[in-house]
Amino acid sequence: MSLIVYFSSRSENTHRFVERLGMRSNRIPMDGSGGLQVREPFVIVTPTYGGGGSKGAVPKPVIRFLNDESNRSFIRGVIAAGNSNFGEAFCIAGNIISAKCQVPYLYRFELLGTDEDIGNVKNGMERFWTRQTRP
């Protein structure tokens, strides 16, 4: 029950991060075609776009994916990637998705993430899903 749904742009930073996690995952298509349908609980991993503000911070394919009510009903948490050069807007896509979907903002990491980030996310996801499955 530890599904990751993620979006990665042509830079492939988020894709490489998710691959290093070694967890079951589904990728939101880059073209935003909306072809991905999820039928089980998931945590979304997304990059943050834009030059430091909240406008345009969530990638459009992620917005389209979450605008599908069925997909949105299965989101359980969010992890965001970003660039710390953007200061207070670092990983702001996570804040936006967390607030709009009313799910916890679980973690944030810079660019490709570090080995420490990978370990933190793996351990955190295990604890998170264990808590989710308790009665």
From Swiss-Prot:
MF terms (GO), sorted A to Z: FMN binding
SUPFAM superfamilies with a match to the protein in the record: Flavoproteins
Ranges annotated as spanning the membrane: none
GO biological process terms on file: protein modification process
InterPro entries per record: Flavoprotein-like_sf, RNR_Ib_NrdI_bac, RNR_NrdI
HAMAP family, per the entry: NrdI
Protein family according to the UniProt entry: Belongs to the NrdI family.
Function: Probably involved in ribonucleotide reductase function.
Protein name in the entry: Protein NrdI
Natural source organism: Brucella anthropi (strain ATCC 49188 / DSM 6882 / CCUG 24695 / JCM 21032 / LMG 3331 / NBRC 15819 / NCTC 12168 / Alc 37)
Underlying gene: nrdI
